[in-house]
Amino acid sequence: MIRAANGFRISVRNTAVCLAPNFRQLKGFSIINLGSLQYFRYNSVYSKSIRLVNTLENRIVPVYKECASPQSIGGKSNLKQLQWPKPPKNILILKKRMDERVDHCFETLVQHLQQTYPDICIITETDVAKKFSYLNLYTWTEISDLEQKVDAIITVGGDGTILHAASLFARSGMPPILSFSLGTLGFLLPFDFGSFQTAFADFYNSRSFVLMRMRLRVAMKTKLYNESIYAMNEMHIHRGLSPHMAVLKVFVNDKFLTEAVADGLIISTPTGSTAYSLSSGGPIVHPSINALLLTPICPNSLSFRPVLFPDTFKISIETSNKSRVRPQLSIDGRPLGLTDIGQRIDITSVKDNAIPCIIRSHKEDDWVSDIVSLLRWNHPFHRKGW
């Protein structure tokens, strides 16, 4: 017999006499009436209530409607309005790892959704579902199940959490994504977590606006991959730890452009223009512009500058037989392995599988104010202590 909180005694069979009047405060205990005695039983559903998404209804696909904008020339907006044919039910929530504050916010969010929207089913990663087993969460074993069941995505964390969400749908269309920050700076985080109740209510009731962020399709053939993979930010090919610079041939629409001798090359989306490409000297591109950005990483020739191509173009990169190193290929920061000499990688834009990101309002100038704030433009520089 084990003594528990509030005066309970728990037996080996998880049943004991109720000795405290406030027994209803304990989670996971059901009341059993046996004559004049009240017993409680610990419900195993609270300890092992992890279910699989393949038991849920199929995905609800929203409609994205064109909307007008008095701020734009011609009155046409680059944003779209989200319209659900019926309220979303299967919500995937992804959170930042190894952070107690994020854990608390995650629990608060899940409990609010379950209490306010009882028809909603919360899906999360397996280790998170085990850690918060008392919340009755769903998880998955096959990515294909996730692609077929998830109606919408919520992220709690930073830009990296959004990239992780995009990687889970790297071979399929992506549901709309609602992102919350916890005070950290990020180019992809429109909402502070303190506003999650209002933001989700607007999202749930089709009052949200969406910015469609284009993705890249990276077609390649390696020992591990022989298919196309989507990228939200960029793909880059880099010499890695080798002391030798990579020699890379670049083709545009199958026409030879240049043979670059550099640490590597970056092909990024407008969304990715504020990531690795920006650190390598690339320009900042508005996310509503559909374009491919080619940025060299520490090129041997100073004449090789970043180039912006239309999204209708195809960029191909091939490791030259002059290269003394097998460069490493990475997509959105995830290494995929070494490339072979003569291997070609084709990069194109993806229009039909863009990432629908929920934004704060229908005003398109939010991006301008966000850039000014995040990059601290127009802020004077001061020494600490002055």
Swiss-Prot record:
It comes from the Eukaryota. HAMAP family: NAD_kinase (MF_00361). Pfam families: NAD_kinase, NAD_kinase_C. The keyword Secreted does not apply. This is NADH kinase pos5, mitochondrial. One of its GO terms (molecular function) is NAD+ kinase activity. Phosphorylates both NADH and NAD(+), with a preference for NADH. Anti-oxidant factor and key source of the cellular reductant NADPH. PANTHER family: NAD KINASE (PTHR20275), NADH KINASE POS5, MITOCHONDRIAL (PTHR20275:SF26). InterPro entries: ATP-NAD_kinase_N, ATP-NAD_kinase_PpnK-typ_C, NAD/diacylglycerol_kinase_sf, NADK. Keywords: ATP-binding, Kinase, Mitochondrion, NAD, NADP, Nucleotide-binding, Transferase, Transit peptide. Its main location: mitochondrion.
